[in-house]
Design a protein with these regions (language model features):
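Conserved donor NDP-sugar-binding/catalytic core segment of glycosyltransferases
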Residues: 92-127
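Glycine-rich, basic loop-to-helix element that forms the pyrophosphate-binding segment
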Residues: 59-77, 98
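N-proximal low-complexity "stem/linker" segments adjacent to membrane-targeting elements
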Residues: 1-24
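Short aromatic/hydrophobic "clamp" motif used to bind/position activated sugar donors
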Residues: 82
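A conserved acidic beta->alpha catalytic loop
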Residues: 21, 38-46, 62
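A short, conserved alpha-helix in the catalytic core of glycosyltransferases
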Residues: 161-164, 169-220
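Non-catalytic, C-terminal membrane-associated alpha-helical segments of glycosyltransferases
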Residues: 235-243, 254-300
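Short, flexible, basic/aromatic active-site loop/helix in glycosyltransferases
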Residues: 131-168
């Protein structure tokens, strides 16, 4: 059986579609609980959710952040498997059955990711590698976008088409199917990360303890992408950069952390703004400046 954790924040109809994909067809028979953690949403998303014996809703009085909200859900998970699922994701007809079958047949990994299709049905990049300081330079300078096979991206494996199954460093938290028992080995998400990088940090700790993550190209789900944070672009960039620096400070040497900090503050904003100017996207330049102002104010 599977416990499913969904963190909601102003997800509108996305949340309803997500829940409907779980309780329809062949998926519901494998579900123990659907745990929805709401981070003080101001929209109507929760009011759309039907009453169902397997649905548990926890409403936070303030936005606790993604990591903390996930942990609230993880604490309630007692089934053999736990699925962390984004509210802007949807299961296909046999997704849960196929995940359980894959876990039990291969029986050599702790975390499973699947092919995530966007709204147009195209495969999206959903796996990442553990980053290194030099790869952050490749990203900050734009080299990884120009020639990703030569200058390997720091995180997202854009140099791989995701059309084959393989072991990976990390699968995206939008769909993260896990052995519930791993929480006893390595704990939950690190709540220092308000949002972003929490699943990367989790996967790194898993790997350090002998665990593995696996990507199955044969199992599919839908992920619209961006969720509600795509509507707050400056804040989204700020939170991403903030979590990047937290991750670097936690996992890199002092020199490595300082190098990532230099790339983040001095190289990346120039690269971003030059590319935006070349595209004539001047509105986005404002978002970049706002994000860095927030980063400086928060003493990253």
């Amino acid at each position: 059986m599977v416990d499913i954790v969904i963190v909601n924040w102003n997800s509108n109809e996305y949340l309803l579609k997500c829940v409907q994909s779980i309780i329809r067809d062949n998926n519901e028979q494998y579900v123990n609980k659907i745990i929805i953690i709401d981070n003080n949403s101001s929209d109507y998303s929760l009011s759309l959710i039907p009453k169902h014996p397997k649905i548990i809703i926890i409403q936070n009085k303030q936005n606790q952040g993604f990591s903390r909200a996930c942990n609230q859900g993880f604490e309630l998970c007692k089934a053999s498997y736990t699925l962390l699922l984004n509210p802007d994701a949807q299961l296909m007809n046999n997704t849960l059955h196929e995940c359980i079958y894959c876990m039990e047949q291969i029986n050599a990994f702790d975390v499973l990711g699947v092919t995530l299709l966007n709204d147009e049905g195209k495969i999206t990049c959903s796996c990442s590698r553990f980053p290194s300081p030099i790869r952050y330079f490749y990203d900050a300078s734009g080299l990884s976008k120009v020639a990703p096979r030569v200058f390997t991206p720091a995180l997202l494996m854009t140099d791989w088409d995701h059309k084959t199954s393989r072991y990976v460093d990390q699968v995206m938290g939008a769909f993260m199917f896990m052995q519930t028992s791993i929480f006893e080995k390595i704990g939950f998400f690190d709540e220092q990360f308000f949002v972003y990088y929490e699943e990367l940090d989790f996967s790194r700790r898993l790997f350090a303890n002998g665990g593995k993550s696996y990507f199955s190209s044969n199992i599919k789900a839908i992920h619209s992408g961006g969720g509600t944070t795509k509507n707050v672009k400056a804040t989204r960039l700020f939170l991403n950069l903030q979590s990047r620096l937290l991750y670097a400070k936690k996992h890199f040497s002092g020199g490595g952390y300082n190098f990532v900090k230099f790339c983040t503050f001095f190289i990346e904003p120039i690269t971003r703004n030059v590319l935006l100017m070349l595209r004539g996207n001047f509105r986005e330049i404002k978002n970049v400046f706002q994000a860095y102002i927030l980063l400086i104010k928060n003493k990253a």
